């Protein structure tokens, strides 16, 4: 039985899955059309979303900040918040698209682990994992599909 506080807000479901739709569309397009454009689009979108997921920690840290106390916990939260963005930025300069997909997949998996632990420790609402886990599964599946089907042009 789910308590009301454990239920995922409908708007979070709507926006979360809407945010996953470009992953699905770009993965499908990358299969249908053998153009690097769709894989590149998938990589850029994945980098943006990975950055967004890290940024959630910045917002949460600012909300929890009281009287400008820069505790060790706050420093950790702020560090966690920028790490995915820095990783994503580095990935965007990788020329080998398959390598970029591998690094993005690792980044999403690592971020999910951090989020699951943070939620279990009460940092996020109880429902957050119930939303994040399936969304991350969709993202990883799309990245795996793109990795499998993408064949770089041999010149």
What is the predicted role of each segment?
Residues 17-24, 43-65, 72-90:
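Core segments of alpha-helical transmembrane spans in multipass integral membrane proteins
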Residues 145-155:
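Juxtamembrane boundary at the C-terminal end of a transmembrane helix
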């Amino acid at each position: 039985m789910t308590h009301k506080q454990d239920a995922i807000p409908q708007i979070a479901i709507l926006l979360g899955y809407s945010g996953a739709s470009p992953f699905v569309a770009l993965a499908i397009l990358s299969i249908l059309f053998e153009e690097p454009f769709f894989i590149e689009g998938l990589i850029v979108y994945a980098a943006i979303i990975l950055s967004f997921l890290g940024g959630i920690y910045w917002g949460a840290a600012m909300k929890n900040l009281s009287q400008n106390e820069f505790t060790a916990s706050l420093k950790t939260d702020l560090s966690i918040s920028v790490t995915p963005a820095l990783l994503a930025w580095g990935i965007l300069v990788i020329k080998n698209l398959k390598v970029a997909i591998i690094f993005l997949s690792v980044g999403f998996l690592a971020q999910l682990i951090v989020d699951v632990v943070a939620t279990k420790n009460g940092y996020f609402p109880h429902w957050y994992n119930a939303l994040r886990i399936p969304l991350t599964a969709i993202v990883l599946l799309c990245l795996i599909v793109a990795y499998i089907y993408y064949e770089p042009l041999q010149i």
